[in-house]
Amino acid sequence: MMFDHNLFDSYRTLLQSTDLQRAYQEFIRWFRYLRSQLERQMPDFRFQNGISENAMDYAYFSFFSQMLKENNLKLVVVFVHKSFQLEVWLSGTNRSAQCRWADRMRDHLLPMGMEATDDPEHTDYLVRLPVQVDLPDGDAAVAAVKVAAEKLAGVLL
C-alpha cells in the first residue's frame, strides 16, 4: 500500500522547521489539566479515564452525573483543532439514545449560544455550546467549561 509522499514530506518539514511537536505536546498537557481539574471540582460526575485524540480532528473526554447516566446521556469536552474551538457537548451514550433524545428535544427552545444537531444519526452531539475563553489560561478554561457543562446539563430540567 502506498501513501502520499507529499504529505509525508510536509509533515517532516513541519516537524523540522516549526515548534509543531512542542506546541502539540503543550496542547495535550493543557487538555489533560482541564480534565483533571474538572474531575477534582465536579465530584458528582464520573469522568472517562483519559483524553481521546482523534487524528487532530478533535480531542475529547466525556463525563456524566447519575441523572445523565440514567437518561443515557453524557457531557463531552471537545477541542476542534481546525477551528481552534473549545466546546462542550451534550451527547447520547450511543446512537440510539441520541436519536431518541433528539426527537424529544426537537421543539425545545435552547438558550442563546447553544446549537442543536440537525442530524443526530451522523453527529456526535445533541447540543453543543462553544466556550469563549483565553485558552492558555488554564484556570479560566476550567471555570468556563464548568459553567458550560452545568448549562448543558440544565437543558434537561
Residues of each region from the PLM?
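Aromatic- and glycine-enriched beta-alpha-beta binding-site module
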Residues: 59-107
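Short amphipathic alpha-helical segments
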Residues: 22-30, 97, 140-144, 148
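Conserved aromatic-histidine-acidic binding/catalytic patches
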Residues: 18-26, 65, 89-93, 137-140
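Contiguous interface-forming segments/domains that mediate binding rather than catalysis
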Residues: 4, 45, 71, 83-85, ...
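Hydrophobic, Leu/Ile/Phe/Ala-enriched alpha-helical segments that form helix-helix packing faces
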Residues: 30-42, 105, 109, 145-156
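Well-ordered alpha/beta subsegment
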Residues: 110-147, 154
